[in-house]
């Protein structure tokens, strides 16, 4: 597939050599706040105006591929495409609401973006029915479907979304050729499997292990404070004046002591370093050490500042991103299967099977 006439040849330029600004799109200009869309193939960003896409279509983009990816010049699967092992990707659009001047995507299992627009469309059709006979036909259709949701789907081909049941060898040959050997579907399913079985469980496990380690660290802090309080009480009780009477404690002497916790960072927090008792004992015997059992024991550590919140936020963001990717891949697989099912049934009809 060749590039559109309005699209310049591909350039690998990512930064303006004069200004040092990052550049994007086919125009290789910086981001000045214009409406842009991200390519799912090469991860670059493109201006709607440069791609000749009306801005009102911004909510209808489901999966976008730039002209270079659609031509096989860039993208994750460009090598497979060059070797003839894959098909060129295409931009997928969400179904537009049936109201002519509305550019919002349809709700699931609906032809409208909202119930209000559904009622508006039906009311418009009803107002155009000129005779009682026309209204009687519509009334009969509603009565036959029995439910408003079924009426909304009246005339749709639900079998297109269902798995194909192959009955003959000829049908199997067509099914294998169109569906089984489709590299786009295989790539999407492989990506989904990797997200579900490798990436997502990995980061969930990392977050779980971090929480376990933080629980261990809290127990360490608790035991260290207990020892600190016991030591302070022992010192106060041992202070007696020359008459053999105990001195009065200074007001709020124990409370005025700053409560500090050690840094607690450990590069191998996926496993608990040792028991709480062992760590507290070893720390008590060597309070000058800056690391015990690979745990940073500095009282004020700038190197590992906010390491807990940083790691937690990183893992939560990764999990959220992967869950969004999982949902998106599931939708893409569903859409691709529907495309292939249509191709399969068209070929069945063409061959007269």
From Swiss-Prot:
Origin: domain of life: Eukaryota
Compartments where located: Nucleus
UniProt xrefs under InterPro entries: Spp1/CFP1, Zinc_finger_PHD-type_CS, Znf_FYVE_PHD, Znf_PHD, Znf_PHD-finger, Znf_RING/FYVE/PHD
Residues at which Zn(2+) 2 binds: 39, 42, 66, 69
Any one GO molecular function term: zinc ion binding
PHD-type zinc finger locations on the chain: 22-72
Keywords, in A-Z order: Metal-binding, Nucleus, Phosphoprotein, Zinc, Zinc-finger
Record text about domains: The PHD finger is responsible for methylated H3K4 recognition.
Biological function: Component of the Set1C/COMPASS complex that specifically mono-, di- and trimethylates histone H3 to form H3K4me1/2/3, which subsequently plays a role in telomere length maintenance and transcription elongation regulation. COMPASS recognizes ubiquitinated H2B on one face of the nucleosome which stimulates the methylation of H3 on the opposing face. SPP1/CPS40 can recognize methylated histone lysine residue H3K4me3 or unmethylated H3K4. Stimulates the RNA binding activity of SET1.
Self-association and partners: Component of the Set1C/COMPASS complex which consists of SET1(2), BRE2(2), SPP1(2), SDC1(1), SHG1(1), SWD1(1), SWD2(1), and SWD3(1).
Extra remark: Present with 1680 molecules/cell in log phase SD medium.
Protein name: COMPASS component SPP1
Annotated organism of origin: Saccharomyces cerevisiae (strain ATCC 204508 / S288c)
Gene symbol of the encoding locus: SPP1
């Amino acid at each position: 597939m060749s590039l559109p006439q309005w699209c310049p040849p591909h350039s690998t330029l990512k930064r303006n050599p004069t200004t040092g600004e990052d550049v994007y799109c086919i125009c290789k200009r910086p981001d000045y706040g214009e409406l842009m869309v991200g390519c799912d193939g090469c991860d670059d960003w493109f201006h709607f105006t440069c791609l000749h896409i009306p801005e009102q279509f911004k909510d209808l983009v489901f999966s976008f591929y730039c002209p270079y990816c659609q031509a096989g010049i860039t993208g994750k699967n460009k090598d497979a495409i060059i070797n003839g092992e894959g098909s060129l990707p295409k931009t997928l659009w969400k179904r537009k609401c049936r109201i002519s001047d509305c550019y919002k995507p349809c709700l699931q299992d609906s032809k409208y973006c909202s119930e209000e627009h559904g009622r508006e469309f039906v009311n418009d059709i009803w107002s155009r029915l000129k005779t009682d006979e026309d209204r009687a036909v519509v009334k009969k259709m509603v009565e036959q479907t029995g439910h408003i949701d079924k009426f909304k789907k009246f005339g749709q081909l639900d079998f297109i979304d269902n798995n194909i049941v192959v009955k003959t060898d000829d049908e199997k040959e067509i099914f294998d050729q169109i569906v089984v050997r489709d590299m786009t579907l295989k790539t999407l399913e492989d990506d989904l499997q990797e997200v579900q079985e490798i990436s997502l469980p990995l980061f969930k496990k990392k977050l779980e292990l971090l929480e376990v380690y933080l629980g261990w660290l809290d127990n360490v802090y608790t035991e260290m404070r207990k020892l600190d309080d016991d030591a302070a009480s022992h010192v106060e009780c041992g202070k007696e004046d020359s008459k053999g009477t105990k001195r009065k404690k200074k007001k709020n002497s124990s409370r005025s002591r700053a409560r500090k916790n050690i840094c607690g960072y450990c590069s191998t927090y996926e496993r608990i370093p040792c028991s709480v008792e062992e760590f507290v004992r070893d720390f008590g015997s060597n309070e000058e050490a800056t690391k015990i059992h690979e745990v940073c024991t500095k009282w004020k550590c700038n190197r590992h500042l906010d390491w807990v919140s940083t790691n937690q936020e990183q893992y939560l963001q990764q999990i959220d991103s992967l869950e969004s990717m999982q949902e998106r891949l599931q939708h893409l697989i569903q859409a691709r299967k529907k495309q292939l099912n249509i191709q399969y049934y068209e070929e069945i009809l063409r061959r007269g099977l």
